[in-house]
């Protein structure tokens, strides 16, 4: 995956975060790697601000795969090149309205262009989680800039979070899934 940077930003559980990154690197050669353990990124708000306003400066490939200590690759054989046809793909949020369910940012694939747009002055920054700001609050702005969100049908093969299914997904997010996946 030489056009994808593997990225993790974590100053709360850096050892677990590095382990998650290493799990991903066992299966793929990435075009870049970013691990940021900055003591100033110590809250949800600081994390959101960094992801939305600073991450693009660290990405030198067309895409970035964001992983967290509790969200990483679990089925490398489930990789699909169609994931790269979109600027954003993450796990489906079943509680959002149809057509707006993609998705979770804890394990997500994003284009560098999307990351640059989230740092632009036109992107309305709020105190919501960064993935909600991208996928809901600023979605119309982003789509007007040509950003493409993956369809729910494809996102179900990329990752899962709260929605349980029998699909063998590429990755997952959420420590509440560890037991189900046999991860400890």
What are these regions (language model features)?
Residues 18, 74-78, 119:
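Short glycine-/acidic-enriched loop or helix-start segments at secondary-structure transitions
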Residues 102-184:
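Catalytic core and acceptor-binding pocket of nucleotide-sugar-dependent glycosyltransferases
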Residues 28, 58-59, 80-84, 110:
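Short, conserved loop/helix-junction motifs that constitute active-site signature segments
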Residues 1-63:
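N-terminal anchoring/stem segment of glycosyltransferases
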Residues 11-14, 39-41, 70-73, 94-96, ...:
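Short, solvent-exposed loop/turn segments at secondary-structure junctions
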Residues 61-73:
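Short beta-strand-to-loop acidic/aromatic patch adjacent to the donor-nucleotide binding site
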Residues 33, 69-70, 111, 134:
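Generic structural signal for small/hydrophobic residues in well-ordered secondary structure
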Residues 71-102:
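Conserved donor-nucleotide/metal-binding helix-loop-beta segment in metal-dependent transferases, i.e.
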